[in-house]
């Protein structure tokens, strides 16, 4: 796991030096808010807005090797840049632009995972929203772990409001109902 933290530290340092708005999301942040588990990569959201993605992707690809030959084209099409940190570990950088992502980055707080590894991370509520929205079996397990570990501390109204908006775009209203069951 230390190699993943080293990879995150390197990419976070690069982004912070440019004063970009970003935070860790995904499996590393599950350690803070949910049931800790193994993860093979570091995931971040980087606020790029719409139409400005290339201004962020190009400097990242000048510094870090893309995980695909068409890394820039893939990133611009799919809104996620797949790179390797210098230690060879995978880092996924999602390009943020939605109201939810802007809110998530404003709510992000610093967390010390271990000495020397302090990163901005999304809130428990925002991580729950992303996990429920993704909806894969492992994501639902993570959402359940967050709900259990943070029982009584989560802003359920915030979660359900943002999840409902995202699920409307994806046309998956049943996701909100599943999430509501975990939050009671």
Residues covered by each model-derived region:
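Compositionally biased terminal segments of proteins
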Residues: 1-184
């Amino acid at each position: 796991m230390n190699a993943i933290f080293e990879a995150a530290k390197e990419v976070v340092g690069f982004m912070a030096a440019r004063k970009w708005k970003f935070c860790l999301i995904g499996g590393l942040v599950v350690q803070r808010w949910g049931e800790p588990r193994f993860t093979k990569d570091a995931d971040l959201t980087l606020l790029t807005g719409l139409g400005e993605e290339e201004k962020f992707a190009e400097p990242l690809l000048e510094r870090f090797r893309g995980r695909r030959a068409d890394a820039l084209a893939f990133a611009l099409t799919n809104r996620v840049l797949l790179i390797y940190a210098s230690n060879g570990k995978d880092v996924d950088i999602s390009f943020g632009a939605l109201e939810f992502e802007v809110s998530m980055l404003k709510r992000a707080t610093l967390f010390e995972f271990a000495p020397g590894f302090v990163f901005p991370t999304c809130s428990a509520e925002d991580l729950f929203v992303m996990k429920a929205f993704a909806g894969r079996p492992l994501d639902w397990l993570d959402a359940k772990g967050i709900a259990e570990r943070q029982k009584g501390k989560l802003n359920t109204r915030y979660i359900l409001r943002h999840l409902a908006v995202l699920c409307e775009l994806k046309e998956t209203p049943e996701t909100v109902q599943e999430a509501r069951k975990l939050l009671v």
